[in-house]
Amino acid sequence: MIARIWSGESPLWRLLLPLSWLYGLVSGAIRLSYKLGLKRAWRAPVPVVVVGNLTAGGNGKTPVVIWLVEKLQQRGVRVGVVSRGYGGKAAAYPLLLTPETTTAEAGDEPVLIYQRTGAPVAVAPERAAAVKAILAAHNVQIIITDDGLQHYRLARDIEIVVIDGVRRFGNGWWLPAGPMRERASRLKTVDAAIVNGGVARAGEIPMQLAPGLAVNLRTGARCDVAQLSNIVAMAGIGHPPRFFATLEACGAHPQKCVPLADHQTLAPADVQALVGEGQTLVMTEKDAVKCRAFAEDNWWFLPVDARLSGEQPDKLLQHITSLVR
């Protein structure tokens, strides 16, 4: 229902317009207060790059963060990552991730980024506190924030927006009548707009999510996902249909697709109940970090990597590395 409202297919969005105007007024006032200096943002002693969204829902932001961290690491840059830690609840904040940190404490995306990149990762509702925790423990040269475009309490040097190339901005309205956290005109002020799928427009960076080999959660064995049979697909991400479409494009045709809420807590019994005799469970990598501790032999995940095309990605990376002292 929400997807139909936000896309404009359902006329119910009109009933939510008063709340959307209120949301837009408040969010605009917050940004203006920092722009005019009425509120002061904290500036880190190292450059800060924000990777965020203008809309609610999954746009492919976390793969972009991983891509950016890995590209900077390849250039010899020491990178730290901070996040709000949605879906997790730590005993105390800021929380600096270790190999023992669970998704229940830090959230699924920070754990995924930590496991994929090996970069220092810290989570806290107040992003500045997370940055300070990393700087106190690690000699990093730059900070990447996973989300936080609207978190103006943390000053930033580079802003990158990730856009769903198929859904783009829906009906264009603020939450809750539409998907917008800020108006599309905000794109004029960011340093880069990366478009996941669909057709990128002038000045935007095209991106595709490229699937790899399916990985068994228990053994680490790898195979082409199309070789798996009797698949039940599970996706607890911002936009589950994208994952299901990826499986179809890979030649894997799920018998059943199970969409879950983004950051949803996964209980062992609930996940086990999805899979019948002779079936194979295939999930996203973000779900896998939550399920690995209780995985069954027939559970697999399909990793995806961001693939950015054209000359703009290199120019963006050059711009970012030029800020590193």
Curated annotation (Swiss-Prot):
Pathway: Glycolipid biosynthesis; lipid IV(A) biosynthesis; lipid IV(A) from (3R)-3-hydroxytetradecanoyl-[acyl-carrier-protein] and UDP-N-acetyl-alpha-D-glucosamine: step 6/6. Keywords: ATP-binding, Kinase, Lipid A biosynthesis, Lipid biosynthesis, Lipid metabolism, Nucleotide-binding, Transferase. The keyword Kinase applies. GO terms for biological process: lipid A biosynthetic process; lipopolysaccharide core region biosynthetic process. Pfam families: LpxK. It catalyses: a lipid A disaccharide + ATP = a lipid IVA + ADP + H(+). Its EC number is 2.7.1.130. This is Tetraacyldisaccharide 4'-kinase. It comes from Salmonella dublin (strain CT_02021853).
